[in-house]
């Protein structure tokens, strides 16, 4: 078992523009909360499986296409994302496949995947589009919500950021969230 109980794995390639959205979310949690590791999952695939091993709970955040109605939408998957989602980058296997294999192997007790709808992926482009940046912020809020659910006590900068019970309508370009079971 790892020292820290929770891993936040960001996937993507920051040199492919919007594909780097998952990495941006992960970076927001680096050093932010004791008991939580922020992990660069690279471009995902089979390499995710050993990264998950030994954690009680893992959140995987990745750029995805075909999951939202508009760019910046955020979807929280309590079960592996559909295996027929179109790939949005050059992963050797999809996130859904990696999650399914990790669950089958018993690598981790609970895995939640957060997808950010990114639309087009542009090669050799740094930074994300403004609507995707809104999705990054919405995904950050979803990770904070999960950490509040999973941890006995709030930690670090999460202490003052407990998510509210009401649903807020996001401003244009700020992403919206929904849960798929």
For each feature predicted by the language model, list its residue ranges.
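Nucleotide and nucleotide-moiety/phosphate-recognizing core
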Residues: 3-8, 14-80, 154
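Short beta-strands and strand-loop turn motifs
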Residues: 9-10, 148
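A short glycine/serine-rich beta->alpha loop
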Residues: 10-15, 84-87, 125-126
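Conserved active-site and cofactor/substrate-binding residues in soluble primary-metabolism enzymes
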Residues: 20, 24, 43, 90-97, ...
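Helix-loop-strand module that forms the ligand-binding subsite of alpha/beta enzymes
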Residues: 64-111
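Phosphate-binding/catalytic loops
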Residues: 97-172, 176-181
């Amino acid at each position: 078992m790892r020292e820290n109980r929770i891993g936040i794995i960001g996937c993507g390639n920051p040199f492919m523009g919007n594909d780097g959205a998952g990495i941006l979310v992960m970076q927001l949690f680096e050093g932010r909360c004791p008991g939580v590791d922020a992990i660069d999952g690279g471009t995902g695939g089979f390499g995710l499986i050993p990264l998950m091993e030994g954690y009680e709970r893992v959140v995987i955040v990745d750029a995805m296409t075909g999951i939202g109605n508009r760019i910046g939408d955020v979807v929280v998957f309590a079960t592996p994302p559909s295996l027929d989602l179109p790939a949005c980058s050059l992963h050797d296997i999809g996130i859904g496949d990696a999650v399914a294999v990790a669950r089958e192997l018993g690598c981790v007790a609970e895995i939640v995947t957060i997808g950010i709808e990114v639309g087009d992926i542009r090669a050799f482009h740094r930074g994300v589009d403004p609507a995707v940046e809104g999705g990054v912020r919405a995904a950050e809020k979803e990770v904070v919500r999960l950490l509040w659910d999973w941890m006995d006590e709030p930690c670090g900068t999460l202490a003052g950021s407990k998510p509210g019970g009401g649903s807020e309508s996001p401003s244009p370009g700020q992403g919206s969230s929904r849960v798929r079971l």
